[in-house]
Regions:
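Active-site capping/gating segments
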Residues: 114-154
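A short glycine-rich, Lys/Arg-flanked "PGG" loop and its adjoining helix->strand segment in the class I
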Residues: 94-106
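Short, conserved active-site loop motifs that form the nucleotide-linked donor/cofactor pocket
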Residues: 64, 105, 129
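Residue-level signal for inorganic ion chemistry
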Residues: 30, 111, 148
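Conserved SAM/SAH cofactor-binding pocket of Class I
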Residues: 1-84, 94
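Conserved hydrophobic residues forming the short capping helix/wall of the S-adenosyl-L-methionine
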Residues: 56, 101, 123
């Protein structure tokens, strides 16, 4: 359910990269509810990406790509959004994926509790757009969405 709570933050017909996709959350969920999105699921584990490829066949999600590689070695660029759920600390997330985001793009990081310390450690070339508390039906736990972009000076 928490993956669905970020749908309204994503504009139509955009390119999304889900880093550390694991079982396809949130990327595959976004692709199911928003067929207008071009989604790339990225994970270093060949076991996980094999599962994702099979799931995509079963779900008939044709606009979704799966890549088996480490994010540092991934060379595709120009993503409008880079999303993660439990991938890493914010600083590492934006630093490792900086080369993949387009100039007007956004990072969307799904977090549990409010990430005070992580926000303080973000690089100077980033700017926090918003931190939204996510309301997730049937879940009595803290969830937050951190939205970050490249700073205007960059």
């Amino acid at each position: 359910f928490d993956s669905l709570s970020i749908v309204r933050e994503i504009a139509y017909e955009r390119c999304i990269l889900d880093v550390g996709s694991g079982g396809g959350v949130p990327g595959m969920i976004l692709a199911m509810v928003r067929p207008d999105l071009k989604v790339t699921l990225l994970d270093a584990s060949s076991k996980k990406t094999a599962f994702l490829r099979q799931a995509l066949i079963e779900l008939n999600l044709n606009l979704v790509q799966v890549e088996t590689t480490r994010v540092e070695q991934f060379s595709s660029t120009g993503f409008d959004y880079i999303v993660s759920r439990a991938f890493s600390q914010l600083n590492d997330f934006v630093s490792l994926t900086r080369h993949l985001l387009n100039k007007e793009g956004r990072w969307l990081a799904m977090k549990g509790g409010y990430p005070y310390e992580e926000l303080q450690k973000l690089p100077s070339w980033t700017e926090v757009v918003d931190v939204k508390k996510l309301e997730v039906p049937q879940l009595n736990a803290a969830r937050h969405l951190v939205i970050v972009r490249l700073s205007e000076e960059y």
